[in-house]
C-alpha cells in the first residue's frame, strides 16, 4: 500500500498529525481516512469488474460476428462455446423483463369457499336477535372511555409522554 513511503516518512506524518489534531481527534481522523480509502478501493474494483464484463461481452459479440461470417455449420469448439455463453447471457438479461400474465399463471381454484351468511335461512330481525344474543352489542361506558394521561394505553408511543421517558 505504501510503496514509495518509508518508515521514517510514516513516523513523521504520524507525529505531525498528533501535533496538529491532538490525541482526541487523531484516531477519528485516521478512521475516517481509512474508510475513504476502503470506499475508493471498492469503487475502483467495481469499475474494474464492470469493464472486464463489458470486454467479455464485446469479445463474445466479435466471436458471434466471426461465426456468422464463416457460417454456423463449420465452427470451432471455442466459437460454439462463446455463442452458447452469449445466448445464455441474453436469456438471463431478458428474464427479469418478461411480462407474466397473472391470470394465466394462477391455477384455477379447486375449492371455493362459500359464505356462511348466504347459506343461512332468512329470518326476521326479531327472530335473529333471539337466536343470536351476541348479534347486538351495546357499548359499555368503560370501553369507550379514553386512557388517562398517567396510564398510557398498551402500545402507545412513550416518546410523547415525558413521565415514561425518565
From Swiss-Prot:
The chain crosses the membrane at residues 2-22. Keywords: Cell inner membrane, Cell membrane, Membrane, Protein transport, Translocation, Transmembrane, Transmembrane helix, Transport. It is a single-pass membrane protein. One of its GO terms (molecular function) is protein transmembrane transporter activity. GO terms for cellular component: TAT protein transport complex. Residues 88-97, 112-132, 155-166 have a biased composition (Polar residues). One of its GO terms (biological process) is protein transport by the Tat complex. Part of the twin-arginine translocation (Tat) system that transports large folded proteins containing a characteristic twin-arginine motif in their signal peptide across membranes. Together with TatC, TatB is part of a receptor directly interacting with Tat signal peptides. TatB may form an oligomeric binding site that transiently accommodates folded Tat precursor proteins before their translocation. The Tat system comprises two distinct complexes: a TatABC complex, containing multiple copies of TatA, TatB and TatC subunits, and a separate TatA complex, containing only TatA subunits. Substrates initially bind to the TatABC complex, which probably triggers association of the separate TatA complex to form the active translocon. This is Sec-independent protein translocase protein TatB. The gene is tatB.
Amino acid at each position: 500500500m505504501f510503496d514509495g513511503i518509508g518508515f521514517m516518512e510514516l513516523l513523521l506524518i504520524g507525529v505531525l498529525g498528533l501535533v496538529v489534531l491532538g490525541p482526541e481527534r487523531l484516531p477519528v481522523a485516521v478512521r475516517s481516512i481509512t474508510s475513504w480509502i476502503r470506499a475508493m478501493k471498492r469503487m475502483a474494483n467495481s469499475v474494474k469488474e464492470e469493464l472486464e464484463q463489458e470486454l467479455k461481452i464485446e469479445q463474445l459479440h466479435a466471436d458471434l460476428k466471426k461465426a456468422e461470417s464463416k457460417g454456423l455449420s463449420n465452427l470451432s469448439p471455442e466459437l460454439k462455446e462463446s455463442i452458447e455463453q452469449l445466448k445464455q447471457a441474453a436469456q438471463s438479461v431478458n428474464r427479469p423483463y418478461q411480462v407474466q400474465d397473472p391470470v394465466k399463471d394462477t391455477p384455477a381454484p379447486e375449492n371455493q369457499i362459500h359464505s356462511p351468511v348466504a347459506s343461512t335461512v332468512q329470518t326476521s330481525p326479531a327472530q335473529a336477535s333471539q337466536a343470536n344474543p351476541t348479534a347486538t352489542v351495546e357499548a359499555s361506558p368503560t370501553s369507550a372511555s379514553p386512557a388517562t394521561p398517567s396510564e398510557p394505553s398498551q402500545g402507545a408511543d412513550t416518546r410523547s409522554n415525558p413521565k415514561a421517558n425518565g
